[in-house]
């Protein structure tokens, strides 16, 4: 009886290991921060914002054991973008959405799996019309850009790992359609910092 139980246990371990090796897809959910840098431009418009917080959902399909394609959707709330000019000073409360795709290169070291990634995407800036937006007529804006990142995944089981990553998104500074006849153009691109921490499930 003990031998049968032991053999059954070994078979279960082998099946789990085999499934882990055959896993070619994973999904992950992460908490994220959105940090937009200070921007000074030749148009005399200065832009600054607070840190926004949100979620990032990702899907990866493994092409080989060390390379994958990834699709991302992220949303961030309560990101206040401040515009300083002469003679105005106001802010726009925004909800940001990221839609992007990337090529991922993974380096396998037992349970630790560092990775790098890069690809195209869009950042959608959606103004929220409430008391935190100080100008009327701000319009939704969709800007094309590119994302990149580097991080590490730590395997906690054959099916799950913890992922930490520094991501960046390069896109044009929004002007929200120059609301209220104010010229908010900076003619600048900026690098939005986006650290994330989450859990991935392999299947």
Name what the model sees in each region.
Residues 1-24:
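Cleavable N-terminal export/targeting peptides
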Residues 4-8, 146, 193:
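Alpha-helical transmembrane segments
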Residues 22, 31, 58-132, 154, ...:
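Gram-negative (and chloroplast) outer-membrane scaffold detector with strong preference
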Residues 125-168:
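A charged, solvent-exposed segment within the mature domains of Sec-exported extracytoplasmic proteins
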Residues 33-56, 141-142:
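Surface-exposed strand-loop-strand hairpins of Gram-negative outer-membrane beta-barrel proteins
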